[in-house]
Structures are given as C-alpha cells and as structure tokens.
C-alpha cells in the first residue's frame, strides 16, 4: 500500500458539474470542444484548448457589450441596437482593427465631416 492520498473509495454519484462552471465561464466549453473536434482543425484537441477559447470569446463579447451599452446610454436608449454595436466597435481603436473587414447590418456609418468642408473661422481682430 502506498502512502499517497486519503485512501478509500472515490466518490460516485456526485452532482455533475459542467466544464464551463468549473472554469467560471458563461460560454459553453463542451460545445466549443465538440466544434473544435468536428471542424478538422487538428487530429486531436487538448483539454485546455476549448476552455481558453471560451474565455477569449467571453471576454470579447463582454467588451463589445459594455461599449455598446455605453453607446446606447449616451443616446438615451435602454435597448442595444445594431447602430450602438457599430458605434462601439468603430470608436474603439483595437476592436476596429480586429473587425476591420466586418460589416454590421443596420449599423450605419460614423459621423465624420472633413475639416476642409467646415466653415472658415473669421477671426477679425477689431481695434
């Protein structure tokens, strides 16, 4: 008999705990693992890969939702619309770079007026 562990039988019949809850995530780790396996990205998929992927996707979603919520609040709205997502993504330098090739349906465009088109300042010095 080795002196490691507490000995005795292992617990059986315990309540099943999802990998998402073990990792403290909302995104589905098991579903992402299945998608990675079925997608023919590699022959084998490590146990940590879907957890890491779920964490990254959850972080990105939370970041976009927070910025979109701020944009909605700035426009005095309580519901996030595609326009708010567009404003959030395009006003954030890093998200804009990440989603440069993405078109958001019903998102509109950023308001932008070229400086040369603005009326000239008439700074007449009166004495």
UniProtKB/Swiss-Prot annotation:
Glycyl lysine isopeptide (Lys-Gly) (interchain with G-Cter in ubiquitin) crosslink residues: 121
Alphabetical GO biological process terms: defense response to Gram-negative bacterium; DNA repair; heterochromatin formation; innate immune response; regulation of DNA-templated transcription
Keyword Acetylation: yes
PROSITE patterns given in the database record: HISTONE_H2A
Residue ranges, compositional bias (Basic residues): 1-20
List of residues that carry N5-methylglutamine: 106
Residues carrying N-acetylserine: 2
GO CC terms: nucleosome; nucleus
Modified residues (Phosphoserine): 2
Gene Ontology molecular function, alphabetical: DNA binding; protein heterodimerization activity; structural constituent of chromatin
Function of the molecule: Core component of nucleosome. Nucleosomes wrap and compact DNA into chromatin, limiting DNA accessibility to the cellular machineries which require DNA as a template. Histones thereby play a central role in transcription regulation, DNA repair, DNA replication and chromosomal stability. DNA accessibility is regulated via a complex set of post-translational modifications of histones, also called histone code, and nucleosome remodeling.
Description of how the protein assembles with itself and partners: The nucleosome is a histone octamer containing two molecules each of H2A, H2B, H3 and H4 assembled in one H3-H4 heterotetramer and two H2A-H2B heterodimers. The octamer wraps approximately 147 bp of DNA.
Protein name, UniProt field: Histone H2A
Organism: Caenorhabditis elegans
């Amino acid at each position: 008999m080795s002196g490691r562990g507490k000995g005795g039988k292992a617990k059986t019949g315990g309540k099943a705990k999802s990998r998402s809850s073990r990792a403290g995530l909302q995104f589905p780790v098991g579903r992402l693992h299945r998608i990675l396996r079925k997608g023919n990205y590699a022959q084998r998929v490590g146990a940590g890969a879907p957890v890491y992927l779920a964490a990254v996707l959850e972080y990105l979603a939370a970041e976009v939702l927070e910025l979109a919520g701020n944009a909605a609040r700035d426009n005095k709205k309580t519901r996030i619309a595609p326009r708010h997502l567009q404003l959030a993504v395009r006003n954030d330098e890093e998200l804009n770079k990440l989603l440069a090739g993405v078109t958001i349906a019903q998102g509109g465009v950023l308001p932008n007026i070229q400086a040369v088109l603005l009326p000239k300042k008439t700074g007449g010095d009166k004495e």
